[in-house]
Amino acid sequence: MNALVTGVSRRIGIGFAIAERLRADGANVFTHGWTPHDAAQDWGADDLEADVEADFAEPDAPARVVVAARAKLGPLDTLVVNHARSGDGRLADLTAEHIDAFLHENVRASLLLVKEFAQQFEGDRGAIVLMTSGAHLAPMPTEVAYGVSKGALAIAVATLADELSDRCIRVNAVNPGPTDTGWGLADVDPARRMPFGRWGEPDDAARLVAWLCSDDGRWVSGQVLDSEGGFRRW
């Protein structure tokens, strides 16, 4: 397996857990990150170095990342689109520029990554996993633009899976649910919201993604899988 994983810039993040899980399963993994985004957020960046740094706000960045991954690994057969622009606000705070930033980085870049991956694909069996959110399940207060952008990916899965099925490329999406990546959950009691008494961990999502990318998941395509540990929203 030759896999490209985007959004790998923090050791405590889901992207890093996915890359490590795929490597443990024997895959060759090429990672993408964009440190300036994390550095500008409350959680900050760490010293993790991805194989390539690229800003998906730039229209040509997806093509450059796929080319770089193929140059190092050879033809790619697995793509995990994990990157995301985060840090949203309420409806009253939205601007056109704010909305565009989320759509460009979370939707446009993701679709272009899928396109570039499919164009270079040469194998007889491939897998793509998009990372979405719980926006299709319930309201996400203060995350309007983020929720819309992630919801778009969930909606796109069925169409992408259909278009790529004749080439034996499966497409699925994973909603990892509330996951402890070091920020944002301290003021909510997991004992009340989570039946198992804890928040999700990055490896919880990584195990599901790795399964979807493996031969064991070969009969699953066009699905949005909610891996939330029974999260109670209300």
Cite the ranges covered by each PLM segment:
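Residue(s) in the substrate-gating loop at a strand-loop-helix junction
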Residues: 133
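Canonical Rossmann dinucleotide-binding motif of NAD(H)/NADP(H)-dependent dehydrogenases/reductases
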Residues: 1-30
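Active-site helix of classical SDR
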Residues: 114, 149
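Short C-terminal tail/terminal secondary-structure segment
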Residues: 138, 193, 210, 221-234
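Substrate-binding pocket helix/loop in short-chain dehydrogenase/reductase
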Residues: 90-91, 98-103, 190
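Short, small/polar-rich loop/turn modules that mediate ligand/substrate recognition or access, typified
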Residues: 125, 165, 170, 220-222
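Alpha-helical segment proximal to the catalytic Tyr-Lys
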Residues: 119, 162-166, 218
